[in-house]
Regions:
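Macrodomain-like recognition of ADP-ribose-binding/processing modules
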Residues: 1-179
Length: 179
């Protein structure tokens, strides 16, 4: 998700094809105001990092790694401030990416109570962190290893079916030391 937790999916700045856009459309289409209220409540105690002056969507933005839990039925989704904008374009930044993922892991370590955690390949696609899917996976696994945070139920990285053939999963399954 972006650092202003936008809920308007109109392809500027939130694309329908992004994980962010797909989440909003699948679980809150037509109920974006409800999601806005949940997000606002989740951000009540978070200090605003700044204000956008030239971006469509919400003007306030929050620190990288800010997490807002959103309960949908029996599932809890953890919305993550991962991307920052320059105008209406995502500004790729590895430092923000690393900070956000490490902060997410620390949050999940406290919040998940031993439940397994499923995360998408963060930074793929529209976040423009890395164009090569193999490198994105290697980066994410590297952060998981460096963090030393142990999620009791395990962390499962979910890859979109379109990534078949773009990521050599066997390379990582064989080398358990990466995790």
């Amino acid at each position: 998700m972006n650092d202003s937790f936008d809920t308007l999916v109109d392809d500027v700045p939130i694309a329908k094809s992004s994980i962010h856009g797909q989440f909003v459309l699948k679980y809150f289409e037509g109920r974006e105001k409800e999601l806005d209220r949940i997000i606002e409540k989740g951000l009540e105690r978070v200090k605003v990092a700044g204000r956008y002056t030239n971006k469509n969507g919400k003007p306030l933005y929050y620190p990288p790694g800010t997490v807002v839990p959103v309960r949908v039925g029996e599932k809890t989704f953890y919305l993550l401030a991962l991307t920052h904008f320059r105008g209406n374009t995502v500004e790729p930044n590895m430092k923000i990416y690393y900070t956000a993922v490490l902060t997410l892991l620390e949050y999940l370590n406290k919040a998940t109570a031993g439940a397994p955690v499923y995360i998408p390949l963060l930074g793929s696609g529209l976040a423009r962190i890395n164009r090569e899917k193999e490198n994105e996976l290697a980066n994410l696994l590297s952060i998981l290893r460096m963090s030393r945070v142990k999620i009791v139920g395990g962390i499962h990285i979910v890859l979109h079916p379109d990534m078949r053939g773009k990521v050599n999963i066997l390379r990582y399954r064989k080398n358990k030391s990466i995790l």
